[in-house]
């Protein structure tokens, strides 16, 4: 079943694994595993501050403490001047836990959308370098500058190229609402508490990886097929992308000749755990 030509996305919901295939080669992997997921936002509590290694350990509700390096803490000055023991702090997971190591977290929150990435604590506007037209870059920057609140930052994603002002505005409003919900929850909850979790694997993969070069999306459940079709239709991307339900007897990853790579990744994770 392996296709050496087309660019496709393979979503094995049964295994919580997805792969982006470009010109017959796996270009990217998405894996949904464990209780702590990349992109999670937590209301955490500072437990230990270690100036000698310029880091702090924060409680995010897991059996392993979150690791917060000084460079990932907003503001100027020494780490011990910015953080205090038992302090409540909003952090985001930038690296999932591996083996005996807990998650790495940051206070520089980023919320990805379809066309934009909201950076609530980092003012400014940055446009993807993959958008090469100076005119289009200026147009997008002007639109975002008019729409965004003062004090927040926005990254304009490659997918924003050619999009209307209304579509960009809608995306920004969704992200701002998410951030407002995070702040409201942080004010009312006690740490450790999960404040926000990014969309499920299927939605995330389509949002992050699906573009005008995608020719096919292969899924392994009828439910996933229906969801993908609905998402593409809502995003007006359903005309050029073929959505296929795999019905073979062997697992989808095996049929697509991707399973060997997942085994290698699992072995590497075990090595990291033992190291």
Predicted feature locations:
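DE-rich acidic low-complexity regions and acidic surface loops
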Residues: 1-275
């Amino acid at each position: 079943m392996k296709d050496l030509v087309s660019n496709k996305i393979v979503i094995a919901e049964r295994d919580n694994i997805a792969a982006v295939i470009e010109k017959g080669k796996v270009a990217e992997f998405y894996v949904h595993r464990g209780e702590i997921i990349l992109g999670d936002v937590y209301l955490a509590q500072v437990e230990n501050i270690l100036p000698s290694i310029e880091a702090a350990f924060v409680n995010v509700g897991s059996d392993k403490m979150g690791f917060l390096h000084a460079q990932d803490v907003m503001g100027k000055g020494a780490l011990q001047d910015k953080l205090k023991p038992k302090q409540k702090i909003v952090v985001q997971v930038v690296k999932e836990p591996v083996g005996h190591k807990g998650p790495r977290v940051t206070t520089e929150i980023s919320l990805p959308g379809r066309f934009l990435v909201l950076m609530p604590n980092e003012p400014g506007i940055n446009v993807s370098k993959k958008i090469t037209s100076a005119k289009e870059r200026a147009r997008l920057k002007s639109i975002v500058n008019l729409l965004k609140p003062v004090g927040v930052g926005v990254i304009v994603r490659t997918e924003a190229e050619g999009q209307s002002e209304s579509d960009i505005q809608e995306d920004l409003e969704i992200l701002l609402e998410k951030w407002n919900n995070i702040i409201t929850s942080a004010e009312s909850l006690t740490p450790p508490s999960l404040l926000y979790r990014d969309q499920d694997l299927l939605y995330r993969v389509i949002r992050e990886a699906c573009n005008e070069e995608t020719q096919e999306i292969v899924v392994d459940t009828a439910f996933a097929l229906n969801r993908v079709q609905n998402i593409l239709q809502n995003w007006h991307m359903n005309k050029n992308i073929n959505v296929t339900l795999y019905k073979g007897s062997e697992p989808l990853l095996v049929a697509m000749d991707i399973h060997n790579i997942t085994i290698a990744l699992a072995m590497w994770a075990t090595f990291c755990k033992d190291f």
